[in-house]
Amino acid sequence: MPRYRAAALILPGHPLHGHPVDLIVEDDRLTGVVPADGALDAARGDRDLGSARAFAGWWDLQADFRDPGTERAEGLNHGLTVAAQGGFAKVAPVASTRPCRDQPAEIQAILHRSHRHVTGVLPVAALSAGRAGKELTEAHALAEAGALAFSDDAPVDRPELLRRALEYHGGLGTPVFSEAHDPKFQPEGIMHEGAASTRMGLPGLSEESETLRIRRDLDILRYSGGRLHIPVVTTAAGLQSIRDAKAEGLSVTCGTTVHHLCWTDEDLAGFNRDLKLSLPLRSADDRTALRTAAFDGTLDAVVSDHRPRTPE
């Protein structure tokens, strides 16, 4: 059986965490992880992976495979295949499909369609019927079908709906996702409000477009109880509000995207459309705060926010 030697195993809690390891592979499946020892045997198919690290499979809590609705952009089968090649063990596809995932049969369908894939699905159901933000979906039936979380893949605009959702889902133990963005605060904004947006002559989105919504949602959580997840946080001020809420004992978790950890609004110079995001890249100070939060426990997840488009 061939061995693949990695510079280190990254798996906190494992006795070999941080140490060089040999990965034993049989029939294209990992069957063992042992301390790196002795010379590798090229005739057996052994390979030295150099500086590569070995990780347990990653989980991506926000990706859109455009299935059903616009499968031409990717589709579930292709998306899960590529996710496996990228090292992801689990993916949570967003519920904003067409039709949206607001019925138990749709949860059962995605579980059935994905069960033969190496990468598994973490089913997310729509929070409101038709994602219209008016009436809650049948949460109990959806949870029984396999839904693990509930999200409209959008901000929950109506405070009363978020309150009822947190109260009801608190009894089920399922988290409610609410996007940290107030679309009515600066509806014309298309990038972070700052020096870069001024130089480029583009309308900005201030940090308040995020922090006003985070503080409102935390106030509702404080009143209603339940579990709140904020999928993408982009600002230092928003992170601080969540950090304070966690210290207070509120059941809130949050994430950010890999894009927000890597780039800033200054990288849009030259009008780079590839970095124009609906939740915009922020300042260098915000990026530093996000990186710090990834290590101090404030951030609970880093997501791909993978959303393929057709050429049209």
List PLM regions with ranges:
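Short, acidic/polar
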Residues: 72-80, 131-141
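Divalent metal-coordination and catalytic microenvironments
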Residues: 7, 28, 51, 62, ...
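Metal-cofactor-binding active-site regions of metalloenzymes
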Residues: 60-63, 67, 71, 86-106, ...
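Active-site anion/phosphate-binding pocket segments in diverse small-molecule metabolic enzymes
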Residues: 304-311
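Histidine/acidic residue-rich metal-binding segments in metalloenzymes
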Residues: 137-302
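N-terminal metal-binding scaffold of metallo-dependent hydrolase/deaminase domains
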Residues: 1-41, 52
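Catalytic pocket of metal/acid-base enzymes, prominently hydrolases
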Residues: 52, 77-91, 108-120, 162-197, ...
